[in-house]
C-alpha cells in the first residue's frame, strides 16, 4: 500500500501516472496558508472547535462552499489546477467551477459511518435531471485537501488502475444507479494496488471517472477536511477522444 507523498513535480500533473493509475496528485495548488484559512472557515460553519474534542460526536459532518468566497475561490481559481485539468481533459474540455461544493468532515474517536463502500461517483445526467453511472461520463472527480491527511486520517482509498477494469463491466447505453451497484464495485479491481489520498492543506487529486475508490474509518487524532467535487466536461467522454482521459481506458 502506497502513501502518495511526491508523485508529481511541483509544476505539472503527472499525465502518465494519471493514464496508468487513474488518478494523480497535485501538490500545492494553493499555498498551505490558504488551505488553513479555508479550514478555519469550515470550523465556524459546522459550529465545532478544534480545541474541544468533546464536541466531536458524529463520524461525518457535512458542510459546503456554495459561493467561492475567500480561500475557496482561490482554490478554484488556481492556475496549477487549471493547467492540470487542461492536461487531462484538453484545453476547453472542462467547465470551470466557481465554488468547492460539498465537504465531508471526518472525525476520529467515534464509531465510523456506514459509507465506506467501494464505488465510482455518478458521472452522467439523465434527461430528467437525475444522475447515474454510464460508459459516457460527463465529469471527472476532484479531491481537495483542507487539512493534513496522513495514513491514519481517513484518506480516500483508491484502487490504482481500476479505471481499466471498470470500463469493461459497464454496459453500453445504460445509465445505472450507483447505489444499486455495490456488489459490482466490490468485484472491480480487488487485486489492484491500494493507494491513499494523503497530503497537506492546498493539495488536490484529479481522479478518472471510472476509478474505484472508497472512504475509510478515521484512526487518527485530528479531523479530516476534504472536498470531493465533480468537474463537468464540455462533452461526454467518447472513444477516439484525443485526451489522457480517453487514453487511460485505451479509447
Model-derived regions: residue spans:
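Double-stranded beta-helix
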Residues: 136-139, 149-212, 236
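Short, structured patches in soluble enzyme cores that scaffold and shape functional sites
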Residues: 120-122, 144-148, 160
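Non-heme Fe(II)-dependent double-stranded beta-helix
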Residues: 2-20, 27-128
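Short, P/G- and charge-enriched loop/turn segments at secondary-structure junctions
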Residues: 126-132, 192-193
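Non-heme Fe(II)/2-oxoglutarate
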Residues: 48, 84, 171, 184, ...
Amino acid at each position: 500500500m502506497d502513501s502518495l507523498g511526491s508523485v508529481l513535480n511541483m509544476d505539472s500533473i503527472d499525465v502518465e501516472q494519471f493514464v496508468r493509475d487513474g488518478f494523480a496528485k497535485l501538490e500545492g495548488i494553493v499555498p498551505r496558508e490558504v488551505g488553513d484559512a479555508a479550514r478555519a472557515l469550515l470550523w465556524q460553519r459546522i459550529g465545532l472547535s478544534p480545541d474541544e474534542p468533546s464536541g466531536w460526536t458524529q463520524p461525518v459532518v457535512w458542510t459546503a462552499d456554495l459561493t467561492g468566497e475567500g480561500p475557496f475561490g482561490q482554490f478554484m481559481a488556481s492556475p496549477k489546477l487549471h493547467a492540470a485539468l487542461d492536461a487531462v481533459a484538453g484545453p476547453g474540455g472542462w467547465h470551470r467551477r466557481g465554488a468547492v461544493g460539498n465537504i465531508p468532515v471526518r472525525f476520529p474517536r467515534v464509531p465510523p459511518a456506514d459509507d465506506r463502500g467501494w464505488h465510482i461517483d455518478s458521472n452522467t445526467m439523465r434527461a430528467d435531471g437525475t444522475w447515474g453511472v454510464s460508459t459516457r461520463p460527463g465529469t471527472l472527480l476532484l479531491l481537495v485537501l483542507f487539512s493534513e491527511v496522513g495514513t491514519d486520517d481517513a484518506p480516500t482509498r483508491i484502487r490504482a488502475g481500476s479505471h481499466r477494469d471498470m470500463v469493461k463491466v459497464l454496459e453500453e447505453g445504460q445509465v445505472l444507479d450507483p447505489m444499486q451497484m455495490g456488489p459490482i464495485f466490490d468485484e472491480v479491481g480487488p487485486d489492484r494496488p491500494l493507494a491513499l489520498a494523503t497530503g497537506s492543506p492546498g493539495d488536490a487529486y484529479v481522479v478518472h471517472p471510472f476509478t474505484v475508490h472508497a472512504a475509510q474509518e478515521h484512526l487518527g487524532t485530528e479531523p479530516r477536511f476534504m472536498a470531493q467535487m465533480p468537474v463537468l466536461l464540455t462533452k461526454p467522454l467518447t472513444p477516439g477522444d484525443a485526451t489522457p482521459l480517453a487514453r487511460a481506458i485505451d479509447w
